[in-house]
């Protein structure tokens, strides 16, 4: 199993230094509440996360949350919703028949989401969390805030934002 990081931009563009904004652009996090998924061992990812740690939160996403994310917010090129039929048609030669199989292939490392951008959009546009954030959006997660690394607790936040 490959560890997948779900990276979520929490803070907006105002007063963001140019180097941080450039790194967020490289991560495809152009706007607030956008989420991307990358393999944890992606070269250079740790350094990029260290640079933008005061604007994003990230952690390991699990399979049930990944499936819910694709069903609720997954889009294909042209803004088409991702359905089991669409996945079965596009990934027929890989033997993937539904969204659960697609999520499993991502978690096993057979497919890499950011390299499938002509088939599946790599950015998920989420709502603000229902019930609001638990802490300050300007403090690190370990100091009762929302920013930085949060491990498995990213799944709870994503489910509140679907």
UniProtKB/Swiss-Prot annotation:
UniProt keyword list: Ribonucleoprotein, Ribosomal protein
Asked whether the UniProt record includes Cytoplasm among its keywords, one would answer: no
Q: Which chain regions cross the lipid bilayer?
A: none
A GO cellular component annotation here is: cytosolic large ribosomal subunit
Q: Which Pfam families match?
A: Ribosomal_L30 (PF00327)
Keyword Ribosomal protein carried by entry:
yes
GO molecular function (one)? RNA binding
Q: Which CDD domains match?
A: Ribosomal_L7_archeal_euk
Q: Which domain of life is it from?
A: Archaea
- Biological process GO terms, please? maturation of LSU-rRNA from tricistronic rRNA transcript (SSU-rRNA, 5.8S rRNA, LSU-rRNA); translation
> What is annotated about its quaternary structure and interactions?
Part of the 50S ribosomal subunit.
* Protein family membership: Belongs to the universal ribosomal protein uL30 family.
Recorded hits in NCBIfam families, A to Z, give: PRK06049.1, uL30_arch
HAMAP family the UniProt entry points to: Ribosomal_uL30_A
What is the protein name for this chain? Large ribosomal subunit protein uL30
Name the source organism: Desulfurococcus amylolyticus (strain DSM 18924 / JCM 16383 / VKM B-2413 / 1221n) (Desulfurococcus kamchatkensis)
Upper lineage ranks?
A: Archaea, Thermoproteota, Thermoprotei, Desulfurococcales, Desulfurococcaceae
